[in-house]
Amino acid sequence: YRGEPHRVAPIAVLQDIEYIDDSKGTNVGATVAAINSVGADRRIVLILGGDGKDQDFSSLRLPIQQYVRSLVLIGKDAAELRQVLQGAGVPMHDAASLEDAVKLCRSLAQTGDAVLLSPACASFDMFKNYVHRGEVFAQAVQTLAQDLGIELDHLGGVQT
């Protein structure tokens, strides 16, 4: 069984770091579920942010404390996320674009980690929709693979 696109979907493994697209994680509940699932057996570098639509982000704090190595914040509500999550004790970094976020995640992740795009926010501040956001993420992972000299047969394929 292959999962639905953009719903905790593995994109690639590059140098023992797995890149996972959960662009459909457009609200806090979905992102909490993704963090708990992916974090069950490894640490996460999490890309979070976008248009939060006035959600309460505080329920992200505990799973982030438990499973997340670093946060990379993007989009309109990055500052609000930073304010709510600053007590979580997890390093936070800002990225101007999703492409920059993927590059930054590569430098923050350690062997065996996952880089997870699960933004807990709508995409409309930077993208047409969550599908577009997921496609930009996948393309950024493809570009990273090329920069590392790694040939990916197809996205969704696992290469090391």
Put a short name on every predicted segment.
Residues 1-67:
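Nucleotide phosphate-binding/pyrophosphate-handling subdomain across enzymes
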